[in-house]
């Protein structure tokens, strides 16, 4: 399924530098590249509990950063609500893409369904650049997705090609291969 990794040697046209920081606590955190010289570290999970602030009045960058942060919450409900809103704003900043890609290896099928339904609208040249720059993370996510399917969904969905997680990774890989052919 995975092609040889060939990273496009172009800078992403609209990439802006942002400093997003939080305390790193896990060896499971992943580093995602957003262009040739820039990367972000995404925590595996955050354990924040309690009341979340009303972010409706945040400016767009603060709102995006907060929603990205919530996609790492230990609660699947919080992650789903964050990705649901994030997917409507995704075109605002390139650094949002890795957070979406990280959620593609989830076991919560509602999250996967929501991402899959949105992918045709959000796959663009910048999104594909981020996929290509992070093919090792994509491969790890694919393996993780297979593992979750095997444990949680194989009985109900015996053909992995019918599993939404597989469909997501197929779209991602196909998109990355299309770029290299053009």
Q: What annotation goes with each model-predicted range?
A:
Residues 1-52, 178-182:
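Long, acidic/serine-threonine-rich intrinsically disordered regions with weak helical/coil propensity
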Residues 2, 60-68, 93-102, 128-132:
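Amphipathic alpha-helical scaffolding segments comprising HEAT/armadillo-like alpha-solenoid repeats
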Residues 65, 80-81, 98, 113:
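Alpha-solenoid HEAT/ARM repeat scaffold
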Residues 71-74, 104-110:
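Short coil turns that connect the paired helices of HEAT/ARM alpha-solenoid repeats
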Residues 82-85, 111-119:
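Conserved hydrophobic register position within alpha-solenoid helical repeats
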Residues 88-89, 118, 122-126:
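Residue-level signature of the C-terminal ends
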Residues 123-182:
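Long, helix-rich interaction regions
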């Amino acid at each position: 399924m995975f092609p040889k990794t060939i990273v496009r040697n172009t800078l992403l046209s609209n990439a802006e530098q942002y400093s997003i920081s939080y305390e790193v606590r896990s060896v499971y955190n992943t580093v995602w590249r957003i262009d040739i010289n820039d990367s972000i570290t995404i925590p595996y999970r955050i354990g924040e509990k309690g009341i979340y602030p009303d972010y409706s009045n945040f400016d767009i960058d603060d709102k995006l950063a907060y929603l990205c942060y919530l996609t790492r919450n230990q609660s699947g409900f919080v992650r789903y609500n964050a990705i649901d809103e994030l997917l409507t704003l995704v075109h605002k900043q390139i650094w949002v893409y890795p957070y979406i890609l990280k959620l593609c290896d989830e076991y919560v099928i509602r999250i996967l369904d929501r991402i899959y339904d949105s992918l045709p609208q959000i796959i663009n040249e910048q999104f594909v650049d981020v996929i290509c720059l992070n093919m090792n993370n994509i491969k790890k996510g694919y393996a993780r997705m297979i593992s979750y399917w095997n444990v949680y969904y194989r009985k109900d969905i015996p053909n992995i090609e019918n599993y939404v997680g597989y469909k997501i990774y197929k779209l991602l890989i196909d998109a990355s291969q299309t770029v290299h052919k053009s």
